[in-house]
């Protein structure tokens, strides 16, 4: 029904349902953002480990791929 201002009023039950869906969506997005951040942190840790190994053992690492004596 139009209100005095000419706008249709939304039934309270529908409004509560929409509010619940909005809250669930926000919680889902928040959980997804947290998971994405955790995955990014894990990836950063792995890349840091690789970088450390390469810095400390770079010569050994490279020599393991270099052919010796024309092999």
Curated annotation (Swiss-Prot):
One of the protein's GO biological processes: modification-dependent protein catabolic process
GO MF, one example: protein tag activity
Highest taxon, organism lineage: Bacteria
InterPro entries given in the database record: Ubiquitin-like_Pup
Isoglutamyl lysine isopeptide (Glu-Lys) (interchain with K-? in acceptor proteins), cross-linked positions: 71
Protein family according to the UniProt entry: Belongs to the prokaryotic ubiquitin-like protein family.
UniProt protein name: Prokaryotic ubiquitin-like protein Pup
Encoding gene, per UniProt annotation: pup
